[in-house]
Design a protein with these regions (language model features):
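Eukaryotic partner-binding/assembly regions in large regulatory complexes
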Residues: 1-79
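Short acidic, hydrophobic short linear motifs in intrinsically disordered regions
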Residues: 33-42, 111-129
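Short amphipathic alpha-helical interaction segments
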Residues: 46-54, 135-152
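Short basic alpha-helical hairpin corresponding to helix-turn-helix/winged-helix-like nucleic-acid-binding
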Residues: 55-116
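A short, conserved structural fragment
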Residues: 61-67, 147, 151-162
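Short, cationic-aromatic polyanion-contact patches
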Residues: 77-80, 161-186
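Short, amphipathic alpha-helical interaction segments positioned at domain boundaries
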Residues: 87-88, 173-208
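Exposed, interaction-prone assembly regions rather than primary DNA-binding/catalytic cores
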Residues: 118, 126, 140, 193-217
Length: 217
């Protein structure tokens, strides 16, 4: 079995640069999503072709990778170690993430064959209303910030330059790994209980379940 140094030496100088780029991208954004653009496509296939090297290298700093057949590379904490880093969302951001996750899964389970899964702001608002937290948050002022945060981690994309009538939210396959069904059910129950007991300005923090290495400012 080849060692990390042997696998590294087998790479060309240009491939070594791509390797470093992929590692930086995963540590910064958690996901590489093949279908975002050509740059991400190249990185996805490079990671897939060198999965052993990435796994061995990232294990040294407490991480591992998962390569999915649907075109997603995901960085995760090594289960054998303590949590290295965790992105934390406030309650409102966590609720939006759950709503987007639900919309994505509904569209997939309904048999959508579209290469790009999208949703609209009216669809998202309708899903948000199911949580019955009207008045608890200023939705308009916080929604854009939450969506921009999710875009940072390659979960979604929103073309903010489009007109209101044409603006859609692209849901990347990576969003399905931000929550699984059991975690989603547990989260919803907990949120509804807290929302019933919380005041209008409550900003409880809820943890998501994917890992993200924060950059130093």
């Amino acid at each position: 079995m080849s060692t990390i140094n042997e696998m590294w030496d087998d790479l060309t100088s240009s491939e070594q640069l791509v390797f470093k780029k992929c590692c930086r991208r995963l540590l910064k954004e958690t996901f590489i999503v093949r279908d975002i653009d050509d740059d991400n496509r190249k990185m996805f296939f490079f990671v897939k072709s060198n999965e052993g090297l990435f796994s061995d290298y990232l294990n040294l700093i407490g991480f591992d990778i998962v390569v999915r057949d649907n075109g997603v590379v995901m960085l995760q904490n090594n289960s054998a170690d303590v949590v290295v880093s965790k992105q934390r969302f406030n309650k409102f951001q966590s609720i939006i993430l759950c709503c987007l996750w639900t919309l994505y899964m509904d569209k997939i389970q309904s048999g959508s064959l579209s290469k790009q899964i999208t949703t609209t702001f009216p669809e998202l608002n309708a899903e948000l209303e199911k949580f019955e937290f009207k008045g608890a948050f200023d939705v308009k002022s916080n929604l854009k910030n939450a969506l921009q945060l999710f875009a940072r981690y390659n979960l979604i994309f929103v073309n903010w330059n489009a007109s209101d009538n044409e603006r859609v939210i692209v849901l990347y396959p990576s969003i399905q790994f931000a929550l699984d069904e059991s975690e989603f059910a547990t989260f919803v129950i907990g949120v509804r209980e807290r929302m019933m007991n919380a005041g209008p300005q409550s900003e409880d923090v809820a943890e998501d379940n994917f890992d993200a290495e924060e950059e130093e400012e």
